[in-house]
Structures are given as structure tokens and as C-alpha cells.
């Protein structure tokens, strides 16, 4: 009887551990909050695109963006681009948090951020700058 119970416990433990270990976030989950954030980011993208192309702004390896080459932005526009970068980063951080919450696992936020960091870099256009663990690189 003890060995039967022990066998059942082992089987159940294996089943539950496997299902939790194999759980992966749904990066396409959608909620009203996620939709609002994505809309905000899409509306901002046209103002960022020329700065990605010029190398002024690059994609970081932590899922955000950063001013990569401030000299590529005229002095009178630098404050403006810094504000746009800050707004984009706030939305990106909120997006990762909302996707984790939408999956019912707020603790997944860091992994979701990492997944998106790779996604953004993979989708970057030729000529855009992105950050690696060793520094900046041009796609």
C-alpha cells in the first residue's frame, strides 16, 4: 500500500512539475490595457523611426530603447527626443508588466522583457543600432 501511494505521489509530482516547467507566456495575450499601450506605441513610432534610421536611437538588450548617438540629433531637438525615448520606455515597461499579468503570472515579467528584447532586435531594420552584451552593433 505504501509503495502504491508513493508511486501515485511520484506520478502526480512529475505531471505537475512538467506542466509548470513547460508553461510559457502567451506573448500575444490581449487585454484593454495592453491594447491601449500598443496603440500609444504605434502612434509614437513615426516620430522614432527616423531616429532609429539615423542611429540616434537604438534598441537596448533589456527591451527598452536609448539615445545611442546624440550628435545625430540637432541640439534644439535633443530634449524632445529624450522625452520621446522616456515615453516609449515607460510604455514598454508597462507592456511587459501587463502581458505578465494577462498571463496570470506577474513573476514572468523579466522573462517577457527578455523575450521582447530579442524580438525587437530580430525585427530591427538594416542600419538600426542595437545593444549586445558586449556593446552596440549595427544591424
Language-model segments: residues:
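Sec/Tat signal peptide C-region and signal peptidase I cleavage site
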Residues: 17-23
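Bacterial N-terminal signal peptides
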Residues: 7-17
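Amphipathic, charged alpha-helical segments and their helix-to-coil junctions
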Residues: 23-78, 83, 102-139
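Positively charged n-region of N-terminal signal peptides that target proteins for export
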Residues: 1-4
Amino acid at each position: 500500500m505504501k509503495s502504491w501511494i508513493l508511486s501515485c505521489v511520484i506520478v502526480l509530482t512529475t505531471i505537475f512539475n512538467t506542466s509548470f516547467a513547460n508553461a510559457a507566456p502567451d506573448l500575444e495575450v490581449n487585454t484593454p490595457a495592453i491594447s491601449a499601450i500598443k496603440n500609444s506605441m504605434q502612434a509614437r513610432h513615426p516620430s522614432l523611426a527616423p531616429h532609429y534610421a539615423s542611429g540616434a536611437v537604438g534598441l537596448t538588450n533589456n527591451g527598452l530603447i536609448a539615445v545611442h548617438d546624440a550628435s545625430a540629433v540637432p541640439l534644439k531637438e535633443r530634449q524632445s527626443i529624450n522625452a520621446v525615448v522616456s515615453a516609449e520606455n515607460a510604455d514598454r515597461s508597462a507592456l511587459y508588466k501587463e502581458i505578465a499579468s494577462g498571463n496570470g503570472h506577474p513573476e514572468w515579467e523579466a522573462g517577457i522583457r527578455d523575450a521582447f528584447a530579442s524580438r525587437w532586435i530580430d525585427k530591427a531594420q538594416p542600419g538600426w543600432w542595437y545593444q549586445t552584451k558586449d556593446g552596440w552593433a549595427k544591424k
